[in-house]
Amino acid sequence: KFLIQDFIPGDDNYMHILTCYVDQDSKVRFMSFGHTILEDHGDAAIGNPVAIINQVDREVMDKSIRFLEETGYTGFANFDIKYDERDGKYRYFEINTRLGRSNFYITGSGFNAVKWIVDDLIYHKEFDDEIVIADNENLYTVVPKSIVLAYCGTPELKEQVQRLYREGKVSNPIDYKGERNIIHKLYVKYFMH
């Protein structure tokens, strides 16, 4: 069997990520939407985002809520989505039933993705009816600033990235301030800045 898929034009800047948590009653409780700036192009991790900016897109989120709740889905859902400039619509490529490799983009925006599954399955907490949306603008990256800036597809995106750096709204899980290993600290200092 083969799956034939339309080629959606555009580089990494057209990619987006949506991470959701759906409780055991199939109600979406948490959502985080991100605009991918750059993906990994190495053989071992191809396609994994290495730079993401949190955003909110209610249309994408509402469609995803309907899909997840109407299908009886539970657990984490991590969507790979690409914007199609030909018609201005988003195309869903896949859904992963786990947190993505780059889920620190959620943490960097001030939210704890794991909290939802723990509260749901371990503590059996009652959730508010309102869906929590990770709406704090933040740049997640695991590559040097110069690389992120080099791959911004538009002047507007480049300015947004520069502004986030100026405002200190950048999260990099490799650049951990509490790190005590001198080799790791030197690596971060010389290769990540």
Q: Where would I find each of the regions flagged by the language model?
A:
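Short secondary-structure junctions
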Residues: 1, 71-74
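A short glycine-rich, hydrophobically flanked beta-strand micro-motif that places a catalytic Asp/Glu
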Residues: 5-6, 74-86
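Peripheral (often C-terminal) accessory segments that flank ATP-dependent C-N-forming ligase machineries
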Residues: 119-193
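Glycine-biased flexible loop/turn sites that connect beta-strands or occur in inter-domain linkers
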Residues: 26, 87-88
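A sequence-level detector of short linear motifs
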Residues: 30, 91-92, 128
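ATP-dependent carboxylate/phosphate-activation module, predominantly the ATP-grasp catalytic core
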Residues: 6-72, 96-121
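A short beta-strand motif that forms the metal-chelation/ATP-contact edge
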Residues: 88-98
